[in-house]
Regions:
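Conserved small-residue
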Residues: 247-291, 647-650, 761-858, 959
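C-terminal extracellular loops and terminal segments
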Residues: 140-144, 741-748, 788-820, 850, ...
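C-terminal beta-barrel architecture of Gram-negative outer-membrane proteins
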Residues: 843, 877-940
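Short, small/polar-rich motifs associated with maturation and membrane association
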Residues: 1-355, 360-369, 377, 414, ...
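Glycine-rich, aromatic-lined ligand/substrate-binding cores of catalytic
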Residues: 857-890
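Short aromatic-centered micro-motifs
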Residues: 47, 76, 181, 826-827, ...
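Extracellular/periplasmic, surface-exposed regions of secreted and cell-surface proteins
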Residues: 131, 178, 281-284, 305-308, ...
């Protein structure tokens, strides 16, 4: 037995020995040299055994060495070159060719594409893999901080809430400053509807393939009258030839409040009132109504919110000639403010068939979206700060739905105390505010390469953009905030609908030809676009009687039906010329007509010209082998603006009913009276015309080390004239109103942008990508109103929210739009602000409104974006951040705080105050003090993501397995700012009752089947 066992052991050892010898014989040391087509060694090229993590990189001489087995495949790759796969051998000489796809990478521009290397305008393209990760409910979330000069300000945490997008600071005062949005060739309607924040929200972010941002006029002028504020072009994902492939992505997120306003607790508030020497007996009685109650109202209106998202798509082709892609998505996002919710269903279909030997290419797209919104009253955010913390959420009195409500003399059976704060929880729970939105974007594009003249292409695009929003806001008749003493006029029901329809027809012909070393590309086209809007609003009183509780009784005011339409007609063309692949010329011209202007001003001509010089192609720079790209760009162009915001036909006068139902008596011969409605004409502006913006741009695109380091720098000057002003004073008696809409004004933008992207580490196991961009912008009004030398300081606007409608902002010549207009605060020797004491700036011996002055602005001087991603084998870690410098907010919550008895007690009701009020000890509110204009510069980390990628999971003999990625993200984790409010990022700078942005933790998965 022992001999048999020993024999078996010896046999196994011998077999193992032979196997080891065989394996050793199969293994080899692979040495090699990697060069480019010019014979130069390539430093840092990846060399890896295919299907393994066994790899290395080339040294400074292009050499490499690694161990491999006979039969292994060696993969050699480097940025900017085509990868090669070769069998393992002891000695290898590898020649990598330039990656023509990368060199000829195209970007989408207006009515066509251009090779990235040949672009002459200020154009930035972001591909799908470069977009921000994390919680991206709306497409604008993907590009925040990614593009130099583009500011995406998300100032609300409302589920589904949108962002204000500004490219190079905007170019208008009262007309729109939003960029033009183009989705798959459809120029979108501007503006928002209730429940759909902006045109970008019409697309599921997971369906987006790329963003292209056109910034200067040489790039945007092809869109003419709508391109003064830049253009964002979105291209969605298409089908691909081959078998069907299915992708699923989903995530679950948990969101919570990031911080809150520091206010007095119930016990602190009792002590404050009881120990206040100015407290009245009524105040002490009121604060002791509910002994021991400590209600944190901010906790009562906020919650931890759980949200989910699911997306599935399938793409492939039918018999190689009909590529397709279909997708479906579902999002359910709960807000941290109670009762708020955003639910969205999306679907898209894309077909890209080809016919006649690829001479006819079709691009058929359809995208649908259905949204259900549950809005929360954001007044509850401020109400939670100021409501008395010694009172319970509910009491035994069912008169107001059981919610504690201040009544006259605190009599449970009394009427609601006038001017008293409303229970913030009741604002949320006794209001049902919903909207349902349906949106559709579709187009059919036909691109025909003429058979007998293949250099000529004919392109026809027909499309539409349709949106309808139906809203129903129901406020319970017992709700404290709308409780009416008349039981038939209590509560409210606000009903509305809004429908817009945008139809489009574009046709252009394009001829491209190469002559020796010259390339010509000429395009000319025609566009017709019609916009139609229709809406209606009505508000009803409700019954509080038991027998018909909640039913409509009578209308509060009149119905407000509205319907309008306008048409844009355009002819456009473009010439691209390239000589010796070094010298570039682009010329565009667009002639636009808008029905929004009178016939004599209807047409506007918008030209542009741009020059490019690929300096790295010159002989004197060819010797610098590490210089991949150096291109100088010069651009000039004129763009327009016709998005007036004051109706579609301000040049016309309309007859309208008199205010307040005014009527006029008419008597017949018998003396009988007949009352008729008074009508009068509205003001008109027959000379109203386009805003025109002229832009000068100088830029450089650069790249080093085969574009491992690349970026751009731009300097621009943008002059806008004929600014459309909504309220231009006119002399009495010259029109039917005190103000008209007119072209009186101009402004100037000056700015600089810089962007850099780098790959510091590129290896078979480690990779590191870095990105940084910074932009400086200065905007100044250079002319305003009829007379720049008048005594008027400018156009004042933006109410403080109190003080009888006093304003806090102004448009003034020599200053940025919307500069704050305030009193200069005086401070005591200890640096504390003195209540009601301001600087007499004009020296007339008294402080009046003539002493108000321009002080800071809500827009930033400098904005920055940065990102980093490190990957090791299958793991990746990255973050994205932004910074804003020089922007100031009006802290309306602090400005509304005071500790005097008149501020905290009114008509039997007490109100809490932020503890910041004790920093000033102001007894009354000083809303126009510059003390409340606070530095809101910030540094934010928008998201931090850790991911793990996998492939060949569950692989079998007949199944290729699954590939995908698991990831975890923290959204909005870090904010560094000197600002005292909840969040420094406030669109427009007015921080009064903002829905706070939460901090979110997200877990997600992306799987390819």
């Amino acid at each position: 037995m022992k001999r048999n066992l020993m024999f078996k052991v010896l046999l196994m050892l011998m077999v193992g020995c032979f196997l080891s010898i065989d394996a050793f014989a199969q293994q080899m040391t692979v040495k090699g040299l990697v060069k480019d087509t010019t014979g130069e060694p390539i430093i840092g090229a990846n060399v890896v055994v295919k299907g393994t993590t066994n790899g290395t990189i080339t040294d400074f001489d292009g050499n490499f060495q690694l161990n491999a087995n006979k039969g292994d495949i060696i993969v050699i790759s480097f940025i900017g070159y085509q990868s090669q796969e070769v069998p393992a051998a002891p000695s290898l000489n590898i020649l990598l060719k330039d990656d023509s796809q990368m060199l000829q990478d195209v970007v989408v521009i207006g009515y066509g594409t251009v090779k990235k290397n040949d672009a002459t305008g200020s154009v930035t393209a972001i591909k799908a893999e470069e977009k921000n990760k994390g919680l991206t409910v709306s497409p604008q979330d993907m590009i925040a901080g990614k593009v130099a000069g583009v500011n995406v300000a998300t100032s609300t945490g409302q589920p589904g809430g949108g962002s204000a997008i500004r490219i190079r600071g905007g170019s208008s005062l009262t007309a729109s400053n939003d960029p033009l949005i183009v989705i798959d060739g459809v120029v979108m309607s501007s503006g928002s509807v209730e429940g759909l924040s902006n045109p970008l929200s019409s697309v599921n972010p997971t369906d987006i393939e790329s963003f292209t941002v056109l910034k200067d006029a040489s790039a945007t002028a092809i869109y003419g009258s709508r391109a003064s504020n830049g253009v964002i072009i979105i291209t969605t994902k298409k089908g691909k030839t081959g078998s069907v492939k299915i992708n699923y992505s989903g995530n679950v997120s948990v969101s919570t409040r990031k911080n809150k306003i520091d206010v007095m607790t119930g016990d602190e508030y009792r002590d404050f009132i009881i120990n206040n020497p100015n407290a009245t007996e009524a105040m002490i009685t009121a604060v002791n109504l509910y002994p021991g109650v400590n209600t944190d109202w901010q906790d009562e209106v906020m919650r931890t919110a759980v949200s989910t998202e699911h997306n599935i798509s399938a793409y492939g082709s039918v018999k190689d000639y009909l590529p397709y892609r279909v997708s479906f998505g579902y999002t359910n996002q709960n807000g941290i403010l109670k009762t708020s919710n955003f639910e969205r269903y999306t679907g898209s279909v894309s077909l890209t068939p080809k016919f006649f030997d690829d001479h006819l290419n079709m691009n058929l797209n359809a995208k649908g979206i259905y949204i259900k919104n549950q809005f929360a009253d954001t007044g509850a955010v401020v109400g939670a700060v100021s409501f008395d913390p010694t009172k319970p959420v509910k009491n035994d009195n069912n008169k107001f739905g059981g919610y504690f409500t201040w009544t006259t003399d605190n009599d449970p059976n009394g009427t609601k105390a006038s001017s008293a704060g409303v229970n913030p929880v009741s604002l949320l729970e006794m209001t049902d505010d919903q909207s349902k939105v349906k949106s559709f974007i579709g187009n059919a594009q036909f691109d025909y390469k003429v058979h007998f003249l293949p250099d000529l292409r004919l392109n026809l695009n027909v499309g539409m953009d349709y949106t309808k929003s139906d809203g129903d806001k129901y406020v319970d008749p017992s709700a404290p905030g709308s409780y009416g003493e008349d039981p038939l006029k209590s509560g409210s029901n606000y009903l509305y609908f809004y429908e817009r329809r945008n139809t489009l027809l574009d046709f252009y012909a394009q001829y491209s030809k190469d002559f020796a070393k010259q390339h010509f590309d000429v395009m000319a086209g025609y566009s017709y676009q019609k916009y139609h809007y229709e809406s209606n609003k009505e508000t009803w009183y409700l019954s509080r009687n038991e027998e018909n509780f909640g039913e409509k009784t009578s209308m509060n005011g009149d119905q407000q039906p509205a319907e309008s339409q306008y048409v844009l007609l355009s002819f456009y063309g473009r010439l691209n010329y390239t000589a010796w692949d070094k010298y570039l010329l682009t010329f565009t011209l667009r002639d636009d007509a808008s029905s929004r202007f009178a016939k004599n001003n209807r047409w506007g001509l918008f030209p542009s010209v741009a020059l490019g010089w690929k300096m790295n192609e010159e002989a004197f720079l060819k010797k610098f082998k590490d210089l991949s790209e150096l291109k100088l760009r010069l651009g000039w162009g004129i763009t327009g603006q016709q998005d007036i915001q004051q109706g579609d036909y301000p040049y016309m006068s309309f007859w309208r009913y008199g205010q307040g139902g005014a009527m006029y008596p008419i008597y017949d011969e018998s003396g009988n009276v007949k009352w008729v409605n008074v009508v009068s004409p509205s003001a008109s502006s027959p000379d109203l015309k386009w805003e025109q913006t002229t832009t000068y741009n100088v830029g450089i695109d650069y790249g080093f080390f085969n574009n491992r380091i690349n970026g751009s720098a731009d300097f621009y000057i943008r002059d806008t004239k004929d600014l459309i002003n909504a309220e231009v004073n006119v002399p009495a008696g010259t029109d039917f109103a005190e103000y008209v809409v007119a072209n009186i004004g101009s402004l100037k933008n000056t700015g600089f942008e810089f962007a850099i992207n780098a790959k510091p580490i590129v290896s078979s196991t480690w990779n590191w990508d870095l990105g940084f961009n910074v932009a400086w912008n200065k905007t100044e009004i250079t002319k305003l109103d009829y007379n720049d030398n008048s005594d008027s300081p400018g156009k004042r606007f933006e109410s403080t929210g109190g003080d009888g409608g006093k304003t806090i902002k102004i448009h003034s010549v020599g200053y940025a739009p919307g500069t704050y207009y305030v009193f200069e605060q005086v401070y005591d020797k200890n640096g504390n602000p003195m209540e009601g004491v301001y600087v007499d700036r004009n020296g007339d011996g008294e402080v009046t409104e003539k002493d108000l002055y321009q002080y800071h602005k809500p827009t930033a001087d400098v904005i920055m974006g940065f990102n980093s991603k490190v990957s090791y084998k299958n793991w990746d870690f990255g973050f994205n951040g932004r910074a804003s410098i020089g922007n100031y907010n009006y802290n309306g919550i602090a400005a509304n705080a005071a500790i005097g008895t008149s501020a905290i007690f009114s008509n039997s009701a007490l109100s809490n105050q932020p503890k910041a009020a004790f920093n000033t000890n102001f007894q009354g509110r000083q809303r126009q003090s510059d003390y409340y204009i606070q530095n809101a510069s910030f540094l934010k980390i928008d998201n931090i993501t850790l991911g793990y990628s996998f492939e060949n999971f569950l692989q079998g003999a007949k199944y290729h397995g699954l590939s995908g990625r698991l990831y975890a993200t923290v959204q909005n984790p870090i904010t560094i700012t000197p600002y005292d409010g909840l969040d420094p990022e406030v669109d427009g700078g007015m921080d009064r009752q903002v829905y706070p942005r939460p901090i979110s933790v997200l877990f997600g998965v992306n799987i390819n089947f």
